[in-house]
Amino acid sequence: MEKDLKKMYRTVVSDHFPDRLSITFGDVTLEYRKKTWKITQNNGEIVEQGLRYGENPGQEAALYELVNGNLVLGECEFISPGMGLVSSLVEEDMIQAGKHPGKINLTDVDNGLNVLKFLMDKPTAVILKHNNPCGAASADSLARAFERAYRADRVAAFGGCVVLNRPVNKETAEVIANYYLEVVAAPEYEDGTVDILKKRRDLRIIRIKRIDRLAEYRTLRFVDFKSLIDGGIIVQQSPLCRVLTPDDFILPEVKHNGRVYRINRKPTDAEARDLLFGWFVEQGVTSNSVLYVKDECTVGIGTGEQDRVGVAEIAVFKAYQKYADALCFDRYGISYKELELAVRKGEKPKEMKQEIDEETVRAKGGLQGAVMVSDGFFPFRDGVDVGIREGVTAVIQPGGSVRDWEVIEACNEANVAMVFTGQRAFKH
């Protein structure tokens, strides 16, 4: 008999983790309570359970909320109980659940909040897949912010999670309902919007009540745990982003072989706005990473690579691919890959694809006038040269390489502005 492999993705795995968890640091004990939810299944049965499964089907997992304990280590005071976001979700917040959430559903929302805490001044949308942003944008309206974030990478956004920093209105709900997403999370949903969103039967509609106070979390630290395969644990403080306004930028100036190298051009106000936006999105991207931003919208995001010049090139490749895909969808109502296949099978004329390709190359994948963001310093100028060739006009990076002088020289040759942050933004 044929096995229905799809069933494993719907099956809730009963976990054996305890209802209470305590972690002691010296004389301070942090106490956690496991989260479970009563959710009505498709067959009408109400099942009380925690996470559906962990990273993969079959992996038991549990979510715990911090309920007691105030930890101070040295001069660092960690987040206190009562500040829950994802970990304090209750049934009423799961407006449409469909099935119990899995680990990745909730960690996607969490990382979206991690980015949005820096971007609360304007309506902003962050779309995530596998805990990485695939599109992020700010705009004058929430609907426009979502649409820009989605178009930044339509392919990756399919089945993704969108986190929004404003209550969802009808205009935004109508736009979201046009696309297939797994999760939408927002501070609130205005009257009539939930019915619109429920047209997508499998969409998880989640309310995060404290999003309106998300800016407070910029300076709140938590204990970050990493377990090793031998059962050991590494603990670290969560990072604090020191760059919060353009006033925090550092203008590059270094000495090499007795000569002083300094950047010739400061960023314009528009460039500074994009640099700051990109640096905030960078806080949620897996390292090594390089991203390109234009008009407070991501253009290409390179994630999780082992060399910096390589990830800069991958982000360029993605920008071209995503630009061509959006162009193709606007013009023909199909994805670029669908057009590519149709041309290969002789179902559509090759000129259709050629036109898209030529227009994408002329526009340099939307990279002309964009800014370049790097979570680590450039060890050689080759990384920044990748962006310069595509027409970027400004760069933000930590600085601190022995070849900073070389990177400064590359930017000056192209009249490209550059700023240092003085702080790395690695995330693993």
Model-derived regions, located:
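Active-site loops and adjacent core secondary-structure elements that bind or stabilize anionic groups
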Residues: 1-195, 199-253, 271-280, 284-289
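Conserved helix-loop functional segments at active or binding sites
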Residues: 118, 284, 321-325, 389
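Glycine- and Gly-Pro-enriched alpha-helical subdomains that act as flexible
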Residues: 134-155, 299-380
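Amphipathic, non-transmembrane alpha-helical secondary structure
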Residues: 147, 170-174, 313-316, 381-389
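C-terminal binding/interaction regions
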Residues: 178-214, 236, 366-428
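Active-site/ligand-binding-proximal alpha/beta "capping" segment
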Residues: 264-269
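Short, acidic, Ser/Thr-enriched surface-loop or helix-capping motifs
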Residues: 293
